[in-house]
Amino acid sequence: MTHLALPRFWAHYRSLPEDVQRLADRNYALLRANSFHPSLHFKKIEGRRGLWSVRVGAHHRARATEKPEGIVWFWIGTHAEYDRLLT
């Protein structure tokens, strides 16, 4: 599975604390090696066609959309922000 990131994803990423950035980097490496590793909770967002999410530690999430070229990451932030985006 191919994973790509939009420039706006990187803008969100750079706004995160460094420890969360390091965790996101480790989780991305795991995602590339095994997309469905249980610790990632990589899954389609129910009721949101073509949207995916992945866990970045206990307090952060990332969102992506499914495109013909692969999974395109466009957002990363806190779990609270993630919940607000889904409502």
Predicted regions and their residues:
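Arg/Lys-rich, positively charged N-terminal/basic patches that mediate binding to nucleic acids
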Residues: 1-27
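Tryptophan-centered motif/residue detector
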Residues: 10, 28, 52, 73-75
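A short, surface-exposed loop/turn module that caps and links secondary-structure elements
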Residues: 29-54
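Residue-level signal for pocket-adjacent positions within structured domains
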Residues: 11, 35-40, 77-80
